[in-house]
């Protein structure tokens, strides 16, 4: 059987923006395998069916190189075991080192750590989305561990070319400043603190976006004030228009070793972004972000008013954002070269 020429990129998930981006860069085929996703009680059946579909895919595609996303750890584990039979090079995209995110469940954490180390040592290469995770992989004995950061190119349409009505299909409360916050639904994303900060601020409108199945129950419990809007998940066109009209963004989270994808989006649009003080974020974005020490409403409110009402602060942020973008663009180009070397050469 003839082998496919391009790499095969696989995730046991409904979608992965990283895999789509990488697939486009290297001319690979991206496959998302999704059965009973999010149904914890059905996990054993789910993983068994996914394993069978993955083996069937390998037999059909006969790839020379496979990029597999972790988590779920069972996908790269299966591929490590299948490698000798199907004769492909395996690169694992570690979206996170999950054993460190499950430390509150020590037995689960230890079990995952054993599997992570086994996979990382036997894969031909290992990539992660930030340097902290890359160091953790190397500490586990990972082969050829490297970092591939998220990167969002600057848009070609400027803020002034878009009207706010294009993203909002309903009348908006009167406001002077539009604040946005996109969330994926992780429990350590600080939605409640963001809403509390806006609750007492006149003239500010906060728009929180994200899937209703992930955020809806939390938003309902908060009974948000009239200057907080939750439209759910916006399609690409409406979300892009929202970003073009935003004055400030909030990205408050205490999730371990995580760089929210939304920060890359905000900074690509030149939106001043407020984050909780974090060495990892500072190492990547430096002066392009606004760091705060805590998430008390008065602290967040002071940062918002300083950005929106002090032109000197805004101008300096604008310069910092552009300089940081140029630095990250150079780094991105270098990382793309490494990625192509690993997946195509």
Describe these PLM feature segments.
Residues 17, 21, 34, 113-160:
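Donor nucleotide-sugar binding/catalytic pocket of nucleotide-sugar-dependent glycosyltransferases
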